[in-house]
Amino acid sequence: LYTILWIFILTLLPYVGFFIYLFFGLTFKKKRVANKIYKIKKLRSRKDVTNSDKKELRRWKGLITYLEMSTDNHISANNNIEPYFTGKEFFENLKKEIKNAREVINMEYFVFKFDNIGKEIADLLIEKAKEGLEVNLIIDGVNTSNFRLKRYFKDTGVNLYFFFKTYIPLFNIRLNYRDHRKLTIIDNKVAFVGGMNIGDEYLGKGKIGYWRDTSVKVFGDVVATFEKEFYFALSIVKNKFLKDEKLPVEPTLKYEEEKSIYMQLISSGPNYEFPVIRDNHIKLIQEAKKSVFIQTPYFVPDDLLLDTLKTAILSGIDVKIMIPNKADHLFIYWVNQYYIADLLRLGANIYRYENGFIHSKTLLIDEEVISVGTCNLDYRSFYLNFEVNLNVYNKEVANAFKVQYYKDIAISKKLTFNDFAKRSIFTKIKESVFRLLSPVL
């Protein structure tokens, strides 16, 4: 589809299309950047693959091995987790942990708005920097508040970096590759990840209204992997390797901890040979025996993921997909419509969330494994953006997400194929046209 789109643009607009392709279609220079990234990763983690023969992990051994081999991020034990399903919960806990920080605060966000909550977080970071803490903040280069933030943080002690900064967007060939990650790591003891950026809209104060999202706070051995991922991004924005002593080492998996929560942080991006998070989702769905519960604001699966979902439906798996009833970006509503049509016909349970906007990015399998993070189910997240997701292999944690999913169903509208089939020809044309544009949305 991505190739077809560019052929269409270059045929329709041969001269203008060339320049559009130059800035939006060029492939990331994988060899040069990937070699640097892999070199960094090898400096800071074990060479062996985890022996995941623990009873709770045996079923997922193939997936765990693939994720370790492809990302060099190992599964860990001795962890705990707190999920947050509202912006209020998330920001209250984020502010509390920042205030309690004693050594270092590392933050990496796709969006950091200079609004009420953004200024509040910024002031806390400045306060901590003045106390003598190391404070590092990485923000994606297309963030609209970057200029104001740069002025605000000047001479405060906060180390501010922009990921692939774009002073003049149309003259930046890296414009297409964004840091879509949302991470906070404090004192190498606690970390946050999920769908929420820094901004008032995540508190439901934007034009779109109530904002339903999911982020988690984690404690334990897995935090070392969060640190590792952050320093990977820091090495890119600094354009230099980091000294060995700066790089955390992931602890060896300890099987004697009977009540351990097993977690694995996974990363994906144009620097990798494979679309790791997409592969993670496909493997999880293929392993499902009872249920697949998905929440995503953007449902634009590639052919392989779509076929995997179809196979699951036809195999009798309870496939539920929840998408927004309103869109925060132009065209997304119609693209979502295109892809759910076939799944509805085959028997999927599709829900439109009606209490505002749902931005949650979760995949729940058999009430046993939950994958939560920054990755949407679309081409951009799978192939172009830098993303992170956290796999949690624990029934109790998975059950907490299941309970929330059913709460969301209660305020959602279930779609039926008969009603959906009554869409007008004009609506179907819009869906098909916008679907063609989906790789660059």
Q: PLM features: residue spans?
A:
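N-terminal localization/anchoring segments of enzymes in phospholipid and broader phosphate metabolism
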Residues: L1-R278, K283, E287, A327, ...
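A short glycine-/small-residue-rich loop at the edge of a beta-strand within enzyme catalytic domains
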Residues: Y272, T296, V300, A327-W334, ...
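Helical hairpin unit composed of two closely spaced alpha helices linked by a short loop
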Residues: A288, Y298-V319, P324, H329
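A beta-strand-loop signature enriched in Asp, Gly, Thr, and Trp
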Residues: S315, K320-I365
